[in-house]
Amino acid sequence: MAGAKEIKTKIASVQNTQKITSAMEMVAASKMRKAQDRMAASRPYAENMRKVIGHVAQGSLEYKHPYLEVREAKRVGYIVVSTDRGLCGGLNVNLFKKVVADVKKQREAGAEVEFCPIGARSVQFFNSFGGKVSAHASGLGDAPKLADLIGTVRVMLKAYNEGTLDRLYVVFNKFVNTMSQTPVIEQLLPLPKSEEDEISHHWDYLYEPDPKELLETLLVRYVESQVYQGVVENIASEQAARMVAMKAATDNAGELIDDLQLVYNKARQAAITQELSEIVSGAAAV
């Protein structure tokens, strides 16, 4: 059995770690609330933009934008949004597992894949995973702006415009609630048709002055908005996962301290018993 002094040192070490994890839990909770506010503010815009674009994809247009044309998926691109930091449970691992499974299906179907990782963990993973990394971004912080993503996203849009990509997906952790974050893969291009069950007719639009000019701007803005929404959803998911992970670490540290305290008490009791025995033996010898 370890000595009482050694156990006391271990207890102090675990207590210091517990203070750190407890502080990180509180910081994550504060950041999560702010991230949720940003996510809630941008989600209606992204969802309504998706609905409008879905109607456009179903409409009858004289001008067919390349983003509306369905091509054979020979080359597939993934914009993968991860965290910059760790200590957030299995958030990134689950996301990467989902991407890898989907990539496997695409490769089995004969498609080539390339990646655009956003977030330091994603950049690190795909640099070692194998496959072409066309662009990347990291260090966006807890309050990213759309302008921080435009350059990276447009690299993938350029590849799609030039025909070097036939499909484009965005992958991120969707925030469900504090205890649940779900990795999702959403198709960006070609534009998916609206999935609303209540649609009973097709929408026709009048474009002024020119549908080509309007759609060029609108469709690019749509893709950028969906990627941005994925980033803010992922940040909210990250902070929620980190808060839960740090709470679990704090609770585990408390249990470990209790166990070590019990061992310490036993060691101290054994030391006292031994000292008493030595005193009694010494007195008997005299």
Curated annotation (Swiss-Prot):
Coiled-coil annotated residue ranges, if any: none
Main location: membrane
BP-aspect Gene Ontology terms: proton motive force-driven plasma membrane ATP synthesis
InterPro entries: ATP_synth_F1_ATPase_gsu (IPR035968), ATP_synth_F1_gsu (IPR000131), ATP_synth_F1_gsu_CS (IPR023632)
Keyword annotations: ATP synthesis, Cell inner membrane, Cell membrane, CF(1), Hydrogen ion transport, Ion transport, Membrane, Transport
One Pfam match: ATP-synt
PROSITE patterns: ATPASE_GAMMA
Topology in the lipid bilayer: Peripheral membrane protein
CDD domains: F1-ATPase_gamma
An example Gene Ontology CC term for this record: proton-transporting ATP synthase complex
Protein name (database record): ATP synthase gamma chain
Originating species: Shewanella loihica (strain ATCC BAA-1088 / PV-4)
